[in-house]
Amino acid sequence: MVGQTPRARKNDRQRMDTIAKHCGCLPCLLMGHLDIHTTIEHVTDCGRRVGGDEQHQWTIGLCVWHHFGHVHNHWSRQQMSGEFGPPLTWGRSIFEEHFGDELTILVPVQNFMLAEFDRQPWPEYALHREVARTVRNHWISKNAPPSRYTVQS
């Protein structure tokens, strides 16, 4: 990336901390897994971070599988992708084909989840199943029209 990254302000740090400690990995949640070990992914468009001075507000939570492609112990890459979906390292188009566009689908779903947290906070690393179901249903409604392959939990 060219240029200097702006410093994270208090509300930026609070957003990233809430994602890491309270929300977990968004793709894992969408696949039905509640993951607690989360890194922060800054959303990019054509290799550049979006948002300008507000780029820390354009973030989503990803686990080490979805962010870096690191497999769990004794799992193959095929098993991981079958259970959790493809990682971002396999290519943005493959990742977005499975989970939806980062700019138009995943960031709004992450913001929806953060709004749910602001409305009714939950303890660290203890995401309620009702919240997970609500977020997943919101993602399904944004990602694709209903089809016979769309399964709501």
What role is predicted for each listed range?
Residues 9-41:
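Short cysteine-rich loop/turn motifs with clustered Cys
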Residues 38-46, 63-70:
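Histidine-centered catalytic micro-motifs
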Residues 39-40, 69, 89, 93-103:
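Charged, low-complexity intrinsically disordered segments
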Residues 97-153:
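Short flanking/linker segments adjacent to small metal-binding domains or redox-active Cys/His motifs
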Residues 59-87:
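Short Cys/His-centered divalent metal-binding micro-motifs
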Residues 44-59:
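Short linker/helix segments within small regulatory modules
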Residues 1-2, 6-7:
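Charge-rich, low-complexity N-terminal segments
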